[in-house]
Amino acid sequence: MSKYKISVYAICKNESKNIIKWYNSMKEADEIIVLDTGSTDDSINILKKLPKIKLYEEKIIPWRFDTARNKSLSYVSQDTDICVCTDIDEVFEKGWRKDLEESWNSSITRAKYLYNWNFDKYGKPATTFYLDKIHNRNDYTWTHPVHEVLKCLKKENIILLPNVVLNHHQDQNKSRHTYLPLLELSVKEHPNDDRNVHYLGREYMYYEKWDDCIKTLHNHLKLPTATWKDERSASMRYMAFSYYKKGYIEEAIMWYQNAIKEAPYLREPYYDLGNIYYLEKDYINSEYYLKKALKVKEKSLSYINEEKAWNETIYDLLSISCFYNKKYKEAIKYIKKAIKINKANQRLLDNYTYMQKYNI
């Protein structure tokens, strides 16, 4: 018999492609709550046929993620010991319940677990960090209209579950069009919330609103609560990229250097600066900073990770930089490393063949 009653709760809209895979990983729970917020595909019919699913339907107007999360949480049985909030494009690895129950006790309010946010082209985790959406029944509420936060209403007692792994398989065809206005609303409601000011600046970058990105992230860096160096460094990198896209090369380089100073233990700012020098055909500085990036061996468990700093791309750029710097043996060494990661890339193979002619 199980020690605890565990309930999974989720919101759903047009997830027919993901429901079965999600359900099969969640059915270790005692109860599964789904709030459908207006599906027009076959989601509702699929959900109705699945045992354990308790389906509710309600449109949230105006749309806010925190309102939808809180509504779905309200349907979780009051005698639940542990609540698990997931999205329907996420899948737990088998055995998650056993690991959770073995670590949980009545004094715990929340658990963090490993989250593979995305995967590289070879199916390996690319961005991994700890997520914290497992919690007790009555001490939490959701806040913020997007990039919603699970807020504790009392003193927290958090445990770490490194053996519980949740994998995210994002549908790249799904629109993010609501994110920007919701982030603007979130920052309007909470102008001193450093986390969402950072997210808003990043979103402006995604939309190529370079001036808005720079202004917003300047504000992020000024906030007294913006103390997490990883995120501060990321804000500086996004500002640098925006300056670069505006044609202000010196400002871009300055902010990449600031990002390095802020978090010298991260690979990403070195890589980004090396990449800018590469694009500007300054191969001496490109080689220098890409080699500095490779000295950072440990990938941080935060969402800040950038795939290109850790896959074949960094070796590809470094091999070309070394080649133009007439360091042919090193160029071949690094192109081999790139090919080892991506054996199917014909351009890399062609570069290797070409570089060998100079390895005399």
Task: Give the residues covered by each predicted segment.
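Acidic helix N-cap motif at the loop->helix transition within catalytic regions
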Residues: 17-20, 41-49, 95
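Active-site nucleotide-sugar/metal-binding loop of Leloir-type enzymes
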Residues: 70-82
